[in-house]
């Protein structure tokens, strides 16, 4: 109830496009545990996250009480995982009762922030910390296993509604009532949205012009640039 009141207040005072405030519905962390969604093949994951109380330290590698079972899910360029609560509705016909927050193991469940409106290099204040959009999210088979939705990973990837990651530029404490305050928007010459990169990476892998646009973005992680260069090389050799 307290979180819902906070969100109502944030929607009232920080309407979309006003004050550069992006309401956060929940901030969540999780520990690695054994999950038995498939009795034949238990999996180790920190997918099931819960909201924390009080304040928590956000370091260059993520929240102090958050863990990742797979090394590629974390690191300095994937310190904070974000997902829009608005996109939960894409799966309302697949799941009887949609989770209230952290449906896909994200740290920040945003009230409504479309991937078309999120650019790599955007910087936000979150509590005492400053974060920057740095990576797309590549949906993992574990979320498909959890919900038992056929082709969930493919559906999410092709839609472009994957959520995204942020790196931490300034460490600091974060509390549940904190929201994202836009400090800087990526520059026009190299502006690239999460939706655009998802479309390139998942749906348009042989478009060399678009691949070049993405490769030249100064804010993407080195690993993402490597993957894009490999796609370009394959496209040119076809």
Predicted regions and their residues:
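Loop/turn positions that initiate beta-strands
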Residues: 121, 171, 175-178
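Double-stranded beta-helix
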Residues: 143-161, 165
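Short alpha-helix capping/helix-loop boundary micro-motifs
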Residues: 110, 163-170
């Amino acid at each position: 109830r307290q979180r819902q009141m906070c969100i109502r207040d944030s929607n009232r005072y920080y309407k979309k496009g006003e004050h550069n405030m992006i309401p956060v519905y929940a901030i969540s962390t999780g520990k690695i545990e054994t999950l038995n969604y498939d009795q034949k093949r238990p999996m180790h994951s920190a997918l099931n996250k819960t909201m924390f109380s009080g304040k928590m330290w956000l370091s260059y590698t993520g929240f102090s009480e958050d863990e990742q079972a797979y090394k590629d899910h974390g690191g300095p360029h994937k310190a904070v995982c974000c997902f829009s609560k608005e996109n939960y509705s894409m799966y309302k016909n697949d799941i009887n009762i949609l989770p209230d927050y952290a449906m896909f193991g994200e740290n920040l469940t945003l009230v409504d922030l479309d991937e078309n409106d999120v650019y790599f290099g955007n910087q936000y204040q979150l509590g005492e910390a400053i974060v920057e959009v740095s990576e797309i999210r590549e949906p993992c088979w574990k979320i498909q296993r959890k919900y038992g939705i056929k082709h969930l990973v493919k559906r999410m990837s092709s839609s472009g509604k994957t959520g995204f990651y942020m790196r931490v530029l300034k460490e600091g404490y974060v509390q549940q009532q904190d929201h994202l305050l836009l400090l800087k928007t990526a520059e026009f010459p190299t502006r690239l949205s999460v939706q655009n990169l998802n479309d390139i990476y998942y749906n348009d892998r042989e478009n060399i012009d678009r691949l070049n646009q993405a490769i030249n973005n100064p804010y993407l992680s080195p690993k993402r640039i490597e993957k894009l260069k490999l796609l370009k090389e394959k496209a040119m050799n076809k």
